[in-house]
Amino acid sequence: MIQSLLTQFGEPLTRVENAITALQQGQGVLVVDDENRENEGDFVFSAEHLTTAQMAEMIREGSGIVCLCMGEERIKQLDLPQMVTHNTSQNNTAYTITIEAKEGVTTGVSAADRVTTIKAATADNAKPEDLSRPGHVFGLKAKTGGVLVRRGHTEASVDLMQLAGLKPFGVICELTNPDGSMARLPEVSGYANKHNMPVVSIEDLVQYIQIAQQKVS
């Protein structure tokens, strides 16, 4: 069923290219994983172009758990420890402690405040002292090697930013249904069509990167 629903958004490589173009233009995309994994669709926006309106959309239409996806280098730069020392989550989701911008926010939970926090954490010269802990933005550590190593939304978001030539920081949040349940591919597709957003699967991204690597070699 996944492929039949996805084909309305083009062939696999076209879906990736459409997602890259949208991100370069400051827009968001929806990324779906495998039916046998989380079977969820996530909003993905670039930290670089993130707006308050986009953050508000994630809070309003999603789970409200907005995460900033970063590679190991930025995690070290900000001195962000993992949320737990012994990760027992089903998909080994690598949460860091939560963060807040030290300046420019009030309570930290509004859409504008969360954008301020993300901008502070992803600034070129960002320092640990720029952030308070805990806060209202969840950090996620992407595995080195991206989706070829771990087929998660975290890695997919960072890989997409790199393919788009943007700073390697993705902002993600799970899309939910009006009743609060998780949106599966049929609902993700419906939302994408209504809001003119590209949809791409993590498997599409794996295929795209593998083909690109083969061309280089």
Curated annotation (Swiss-Prot):
What Gene3D superfamilies is this protein classified in? DHBP synthase
Q: Which cofactor does it need?
A: Mg(2+); Mn(2+)
The entry's function note states: Catalyzes the conversion of D-ribulose 5-phosphate to formate and 3,4-dihydroxy-2-butanone 4-phosphate.
Residue positions annotated to bind Mg(2+) 1 are 38
Q: In which pathway does it act?
A: Cofactor biosynthesis; riboflavin biosynthesis; 2-hydroxy-3-oxobutyl phosphate from D-ribulose 5-phosphate: step 1/1
* Binding residue positions for D-ribulose 5-phosphate: 37-38, 42, 150-154, 174
Note on cofactor: Binds 2 divalent metal cations per subunit. Magnesium or manganese.
Its GO biological process annotations read:
riboflavin biosynthetic process
| PANTHER family on file | 3,4-DIHYDROXY-2-BUTANONE 4-PHOSPHATE SYNTHASE, GTP CYCLOHYDROLASE II-RELATED
Q: What is this protein called?
A: 3,4-dihydroxy-2-butanone 4-phosphate synthase
Q: Which reaction does it catalyse?
A: D-ribulose 5-phosphate = (2S)-2-hydroxy-3-oxobutyl phosphate + formate + H(+)
Q: Which gene encodes it?
A: ribB
Assembly and binders: Homodimer.
GO CC, sorted alphabetically, is: cytosol
* Residues the UniProt record annotates as site (Essential for catalytic activity): 136, 174
Q: What is its EC number?
A: 4.1.99.12
Give the species this sequence originates from.
Pseudoalteromonas translucida (strain TAC 125)
Belongs to which family? Belongs to the DHBP synthase family.
